[in-house]
């Protein structure tokens, strides 16, 4: 397997309870983000959860904030705006919007892993207005138009 490019991300702890993110396995795509304070999210409730961290990404990259699959499966906890995007020029605190889709309140303790961050290279689109678009077999069909499942 080829060597993956490693990028240094400068982190600033904004809160004494902030946890420096870590990858949990050699093949993990994302590193875990932890919360700095305890809170409870009621069923169908949402919360803006602080990580106590700010960071600086290299230009041309973004940080995607994604749900942790175990929290989603076991408790119905997910990232509301998944994937959340942290731009390379943002320097404020990284916060995560969590929603509880489960039937019971969910308690989070300071230091709990609440989401994962995935660094992704950007492609910047050049948007060009045109008079018409090329025809395709699919056409304008959407929202289930290509099959049952």
Curated annotation (Swiss-Prot):
Keywords in alphabetical order: Hydrolase, Magnesium, Metal-binding, Nucleotide metabolism
GO BP: dUMP biosynthetic process; dUTP catabolic process
Enzyme Commission designation: 3.6.1.23
Known catalytic reactions: dUTP + H2O = dUMP + diphosphate + H(+)
Cofactor: Mg(2+)
GO molecular function: dUTP diphosphatase activity; magnesium ion binding
SUPFAM superfamilies documented for this protein: dUTPase-like (SSF51283)
Binding site for substrate: 68-70, 81, 85-87, 95
Keyword Isomerase: no
Source species, domain of life: Bacteria
Pathway recorded for this protein: Pyrimidine metabolism; dUMP biosynthesis; dUMP from dCTP (dUTP route): step 2/2
InterPro entries cross-referenced by the UniProt entry: dUTPase, dUTPase-like, dUTPase-like_sf, dUTPase_trimeric
Disulfide bonds: none
EC top class, as a word: hydrolase
One Pfam family linked to the record: dUTPase
Family that this chain belongs to: Belongs to the dUTPase family.
Function: This enzyme is involved in nucleotide metabolism: it produces dUMP, the immediate precursor of thymidine nucleotides and it decreases the intracellular concentration of dUTP so that uracil cannot be incorporated into DNA.
Annotated protein name in UniProt: Deoxyuridine 5'-triphosphate nucleotidohydrolase
């Amino acid at each position: 397997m080829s060597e993956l490019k490693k990028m240094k991300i400068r982190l600033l702890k904004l809160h004494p309870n902030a946890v420096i993110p870590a990858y949990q396995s050699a093949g993990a795509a994302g590193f875990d983000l932890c919360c700095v304070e305890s809170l409870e999210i009621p069923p169908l409730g949402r919360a803006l959860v602080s990580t106590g961290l700010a960071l600086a990404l290299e230009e041309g990259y973004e940080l995607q904030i994604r749900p942790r699959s175990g929290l989603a499966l076991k408790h119905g906890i997910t990232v509301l705006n998944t994937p959340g995007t942290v731009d390379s020029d943002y320097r404020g605190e990284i916060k995560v919007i969590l929603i509880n889709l489960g039937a019971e309140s969910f308690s989070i303790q300071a230091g709990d892993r609440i989401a994962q961050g995935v660094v992704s290279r950007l492609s910047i689109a050049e948007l060009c207005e045109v008079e018409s678009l090329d025809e395709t077999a699919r056409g304008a069909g959407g929202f289930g138009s290509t099959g049952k499942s």
